Structure formats: C-alpha cells, structure tokens
C-alpha cells in the first residue's frame, strides 16, 4: 500500500510521515521532490518541476518500485488536480493507494512555515506559493481528509493508521 500525504505547505506532511514511520518502522519513505530537484538541474528553465511530464511519470515509477512487499508513505504537495489524478491513476493501476488530504488554517500554515527548520529561501518559496495552495485541497477528489490544527503528528498518524486499517 502507498499512503500519499498531500496538502498545502506547512500542513505537517513530513512530520506526519515521520510519525507514521515511528509507528511502522518497516514502512519506507519516498520523497518525489528529490527527483524534481534532479530534473531541474538538467532543465533549469522548467520552472516548477511538477510541470515536467518526466517528473510525474518518475513519481509513479518510484512509488510503485519501492512498494514491493512493504508499505510506502509519500509526503508531497501536488495541488493541480489534473497532475494529482495523473499520478494517482498511474499508481492505482499497479498498487493500492490511500491518498490523505491534510489541511490547516492559513494562520497555522504560516506559523508552521515560519517555525520550520528549513533554509530561509525554502520558507520564502513556500510562503510565496502558499496562497495558491489555500483552498486548493477543498476538493474531496484529493482523498480522505484530516484537519491538522491542534493535533500532533503522532495523533494524526494514529488516525491515518485507523483509516487505512493498519492500526
């Protein structure tokens, strides 16, 4: 099974993924952003790597290849519904996928980004693109919903494990 944690920047995807790995140490973590950064090194004029079909296809290939006999958790923001469906459909054609849509208030998102232990350029980029994310995940097509305001990553991970039948 693949558990895809999606949602706006600052919602806690990485922290929740880490909490899931704490609860399920045999699971694997996949960060599709790494492939995107690599692609941007060879195609610097691309802008956003999510616009590259090679990245979206690679996301699917990496996720399916890593799934094998263990569960995989993927913390990755994909707000464009067409890209999301392309990736999700590609994975679902091969393996069970449970998309989880994490949300939080704008105030919470901005506070978390400000507190996050990332380089200032990363925080600035996230804040610059946050407005485009706010409201983008209101569509139920993005998967099961969990609000993260006032919840710890461990609590959210526990909720996810119950939702997907892995508690």
Which role fits each region the language model picked out?
Residues 5:
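Hydrophobic anchor at the beta1->P-loop junction of P-loop NTPases
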Residues 8:
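P-loop (Walker A) phosphate-binding loop of NTP-binding proteins
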Residues 11:
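ATP-binding Walker
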Residues 14:
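Walker A/P-loop
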Residues 17-61:
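Conserved substrate/cofactor phosphate-moiety recognition/catalytic segment
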Residues 51-102:
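Glycine-rich phosphate-binding loop used to anchor ATP phosphates in small-molecule kinases
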Residues 106-113:
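Switch/connector loops and helix/strand junctions flanking conserved nucleotide-binding motifs
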Residues 115-159, 167:
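Small-molecule kinase domains that catalyze NTP-dependent phosphoryl transfer to phosphate-bearing small molecules
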């Amino acid at each position: 099974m693949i558990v895809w944690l999606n949602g706006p920047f600052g919602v806690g995807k990485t922290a929740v993924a880490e909490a899931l790995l704490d609860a399920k140490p045999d699971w694997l973590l996949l960060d599709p952003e790494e492939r995107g950064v690599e692609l941007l090194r060879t195609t610097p004029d691309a802008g956003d790597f999510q616009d590259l079909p090679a990245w979206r296809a690679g996301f699917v290939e990496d996720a399916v290849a890593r799934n094998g006999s263990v569960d995989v958790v993927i913390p990755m923001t994909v707000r464009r519904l067409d890209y999301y469906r392309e990736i999700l459909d590609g994975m679902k054609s091969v393996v069970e996928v449970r998309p989880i849509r994490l949300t939080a208030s704008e105030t919470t998102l901005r506070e978390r980004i400000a507190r996050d232990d990332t380089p200032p350029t990363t925080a600035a980029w996230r804040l610059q693109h946050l407005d485009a994310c706010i409201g983008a995940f209101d569509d139920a097509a993005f998967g099961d919903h969990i609000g993260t305001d006032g919840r710890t990553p461990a609590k959210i991970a526990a909720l996810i494990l119950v939702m997907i039948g892995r508690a």
